[in-house]
Amino acid sequence: MLNTLESLFNLARERKKSPVDGSYTNKLLSDKSLSKDKVVEEINELIEAVENNSNKIHEAADVFYHLIMYLEANNIRVEDVMNELDKRKKWVTM
């Protein structure tokens, strides 16, 4: 399960280093405005899907993918995000 997320992180980093012409992933990585807009769009679509009880899994997957690309486009390392979550986990268990 987590291997899939790790593969997406690796894909984002590889495409950022070695772009592929015409790649949607590269479009997201090189156009921060597009990447941001897609995250907002996909989150709204997920909310609508949950409320309508349809396509929830598909839309959730879209959110994960676009968020990962947005983070990478903006040089936000997933390792730093995970470290922050680890810190918060300690607060919750207190």
Over which residues does each language-model region extend?
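Flexible "arm" and connector segments at domain edges
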Residues: 1-60, 64-94
